[in-house]
Curated annotation (Swiss-Prot):
The keyword RNA-binding applies. This is Large ribosomal subunit protein uL11. GO terms for molecular function: large ribosomal subunit rRNA binding; structural constituent of ribosome. Belongs to the universal ribosomal protein uL11 family. The gene is rplK.
Length: 141
């Protein structure tokens, strides 16, 4: 018989850098999960993605065990990395903070395809382009 699921938990943690300190510790501790076990497993599975922000979906079972799925880095983080900026614009329609090419947008869209709600690369590219524009990043040919 399958384990009974009692809840889900979403976190964003830097790859290879999960520690029992906030935000990981309090979030897992409040659900009664083994914090160190999660940190060890997460760090082992994300050694190759050191320093990248990674969304994690944790499935919590009734016997206080867990499974987790690591998603691809957020589109905004990928855009900031490709555009070479530290943060987006607070007034994206007035202040442009960086420039990114369409080829970089397509590359980000292709890497995020599994997490986006589309099966069409063109639609995914438009989603990523919209994120870039809302951050104040100009897209050039």
């Amino acid at each position: 018989m399958a384990k009974e699921i009692v809840g889900y938990l979403k976190l964003q943690v830097k790859g290879g850098e999960a520690k029992p300190a906030p935000p990981v510790g309090p979030a897992l501790g409040s659900k009664g999960l083994n914090i160190m076990e999660f940190c060890k497993q997460f760090n082992a599975r994300t050694q190759d993605k050191q320093g990248q922000i990674l969304p994690v979906l944790i499935t919590i079972y009734q016997d206080k065990t867990f499974d987790f799925v690591i998603k691809t880095p957020p589109a905004a983080a990928s855009i900031m990395q490709k555009a070479g900026i530290s943060k987006g614009s607070s007034e994206s329609n007035r202040n442009k903070v960086g420039v990114i090419t369409w080829s970089a947008i397509k590359e980000i869209a292709a890497s995020k395809m599994e997490d986006l709600n589309t099966i069409n690369l063109e639609s995914a590219t438009k989603m990523i382009a919209g994120t870039a524009r809302s951050m104040g990043v100009t897209i050039k040919e």
